[in-house]
Amino acid sequence: MYLLFLFLLFPTVFSLNQDGFILQQVKLSLDDPDSYLSSWNSNDASPCRWSGVSCAGDFSSVTSVDLSSANLAGPFPSVICRLSNLAHLSLYNNSINSTLPLNIAACKSLQTLDLSQNLLTGELPQTLADIPTLVHLDLTGNNFSGDIPASFGKFENLEVLSLVYNLLDGTIPPFLGNISTLKMLNLSYNPFSPSRIPPEFGNLTNLEVMWLTECHLVGQIPDSLGQLSKLVDLDLALNDLVGHIPPSLGGLTNVVQIELYNNSLTGEIPPELGNLKSLRLLDASMNQLTGKIPDELCRVPLESLNLYENNLEGELPASIALSPNLYEIRIFGNRLTGGLPKDLGLNSPLRWLDVSENEFSGDLPADLCAKGELEELLIIHNSFSGVIPESLADCRSLTRIRLAYNRFSGSVPTGFWGLPHVNLLELVNNSFSGEISKSIGGASNLSLLILSNNEFTGSLPEEIGSLDNLNQLSASGNKFSGSLPDSLMSLGELGTLDLHGNQFSGELTSGIKSWKKLNELNLADNEFTGKIPDEIGSLSVLNYLDLSGNMFSGKIPVSLQSLKLNQLNLSYNRLSGDLPPSLAKDMYKNSFIGNPGLCGDIKGLCGSENEAKKRGYVWLLRSIFVLAAMVLLAGVAWFYFKYRTFKKARAMERSKWTLMSFHKLGFSEHEILESLDEDNVIGAGASGKVYKVVLTNGETVAVKRLWTGSVKETGDCDPEKGYKPGVQDEAFEAEVETLGKIRHKNIVKLWCCCSTRDCKLLVYEYMPNGSLGDLLHSSKGGMLGWQTRFKIILDAAEGLSYLHHDSVPPIVHRDIKSNNILIDGDYGARVADFGVAKAVDLTGKAPKSMSVIAGSCGYIAPEYAYTLRVNEKSDIYSFGVVILEIVTRKRPVDPELGEKDLVKWVCSTLDQKGIEHVIDPKLDSCFKEEISKILNVGLLCTSPLPINRPSMRRVVKMLQEIGGGDEDSLHKIRDDKDGKLTPYYNEDTSDQGSIA
């Protein structure tokens, strides 16, 4: 009866053999939206011709099933283990979900199991070790968690074990050292609990590849690893390893690549590494290594040498120039001295050379580009001298040239100006002379031309106007002369034009209206004449304008009022007429000095119409005041003597304040100090208390009083404790000075800093709509439409992207949250408190909650719990939380979410209920598609693994494409399955290496 039932139920599959019947069950258990399994026809006699299926030679039984990248979804099809001769199974890059069942052990003949890049969760099944024939096990890129099962130490034939990119959080177990057959061990990018490298791994004498990247390893590298004589690739990067590099690693006679970067290794590089004749790639960057670079190491035929950001001394051994295939040297950020080997580049296809931030001297080697492959020449902050070798003028492969802060002199070779692939040419702070060659017109890819503080002469060539990609032209502090070429006005991509401190003359023409992307214009201290063109007001993104120290005449264009300028300086010209009304404010009093013909209601300028009348009454007023003074003199005398002591103390107190200003100020530190009243407090957080201060000139500023030891305890600033600047104060001032130089429309302007030893005040521009967090979670939050919220997200992203990628030096915010995103009167967003956490910590008096934790509850990236390190990826995670907060209008940590934080709640609710239950119900449903895309960006930013989070520059691009309707970028998924990364994996590392 049972057979009859099967016959009636599946009449068409009786033609199939048993293996075909099993595969039909597999097909039914999986979701196949792309119909990848359409060739699996139940009418066939055998499945051996089906896509992804291979059979033994007699076509009687299935031995291999490969369904890689088939877009299949569903739980693991356990029924497939009924294929008695199945030796190879690959479901790589699908959406296989749920847990991997214990009955996987039923696949008794399995030799290869590849389930990488899926959505599997839960613990690793201990029964995997019960498959006696298993040779290759790849579970990379899933969401497995918990410990590695103890049974894994009992594999009998396993050669490959890859568990990369999971969520395993136990310790790395010593019993893996029992798998004597193992050739490849890859555990990289898992949040393991801090643990040491088990010395037992030295027993894996057949091991060829050991990748333990970013596994939270601590302690020293065990000497036993030197026993792995067959090892080809060793990667221990991105951990917390300490101690010396063991000389025993000289026993790795077959090793080709060693990656030790980003640890805390100390001591000298062992000369025993010179025994590694097969070594081609060595990266021990970002450690604390000392001593010299061993000559023995440089005699090995290396291809890539990365030792940057250590404390190495001495010279770069000349023997490095003999390596026949050397293509990369990155040794910046050390204390290396002497000259570069004179034959460097002569014998090898050198492509990337970065020796910045050392103490090198002498001439540049003439043969750096002898093989015609040099792309990056980065040597900033050294003491190189002499001239640029003529040979480099023929190096057409160059893309980035940074020779700044050296002692070069002489003319720049003619061909050097016109190299066709160069996008960055930086010659700052040298003694170069001569003119810019007309050949610069051939530099069609040039984006950044930075020539400041040299001795260049002549005029800018007309050919410079053909550089359509030019974004920055900085040539201040030279001896350029003549008029600006007309062609310069056609540079539509120009964002910064800084020509101050030269001898330029002529007029500024109306052609400047083409500079639609210009953010900074500095033509100060030249000899320009004529009127300031009205068209300057059409430069909508201009926020820095300095035309001081010229001979401009005529009226100030009324159109200037339409600009949102952070910096304006028109002083010391020949301007006349009335100030435009919105500029006639005391805060601009220093912006117009030295213009005798200029009139306005600012002290120092010629008077207004009523001023003459006012003078007529001066004599009468003086008489009245003198009489009143005589009447009150007796009473005032008593008060004078009574408070004389108080006034002296007050004067002493004020004298101890140090003011560091970053803009033209219309107020003094005394006015700020007198307004620090508890009635003016508008907020308080982990880094300090914020006051709203209305100034006498009518302007409003926000004053943040940073928490320090005494302030936190007493609640008051006490400057009478004897202020003596020290290292911590200098570090604080240096940090704040960096913050004060920031100029961006989406970053809150820092007016100035007032400080004593025990009190630090930061004065910011005031944002009338308060913080995003307060606005979003107040009664007004539900009235924020989607377009306003999207604008806030994009504005904040652009501000944070500027800090990460365009600020010099780059700045990590450390505490991105909705309360640190402020909203202006037009509901534009501005990032605030950037770097404040670091600045407070530099005082050495941060409260415990501040010094221990960088960030705010609910916004902190998960890896911080076990690394206690903050980088740009931490900011990106926090920004992703802000996106989710804006979309859902729920706080990151809320009793409504139960034991979950916002990220986990969004993920689980999306899976269980759908997006309708995630989005704020106050939002218009017509924006659902766009909101969904933004939500995906937020989830991408909050990826548990930092490596999977996009850079902020990429986030901005995705947001812009969503706003423009382009969704292609949202579906691009990185498919790396090997887990192997270098320090240069990010898409936005144009300034990787040295950044100045």
From Swiss-Prot:
Membrane-spanning intervals of the chain: 619-639
In-chain residues carrying the UniProt-annotated modification Phosphotyrosine: Y764, Y802, Y859, Y866
Phosphoserine, modified sites: S851
Signal sequence, start to end: 1-15
A Pfam family recorded for this sequence: LRR_1
PROSITE patterns in alphabetical order: PROTEIN_KINASE_ATP, PROTEIN_KINASE_DOM, PROTEIN_KINASE_ST
Topology Cytoplasmic: residue spans: 640-996
Catalysed transformations (reactions): L-seryl-[protein] + ATP = O-phospho-L-seryl-[protein] + ADP + H(+); L-threonyl-[protein] + ATP = O-phospho-L-threonyl-[protein] + ADP + H(+)
Compositional bias annotation for Basic and acidic residues: 968-980
One Gene Ontology term, aspect cellular component: plasma membrane
UniProt-annotated glycosylation sites, renumbered to this chain: N93, N97, N143, N178, N186, N203, N262, N429, N445, N569
Name of this protein: Receptor-like protein kinase HSL1
Species in which this protein is naturally found: Arabidopsis thaliana
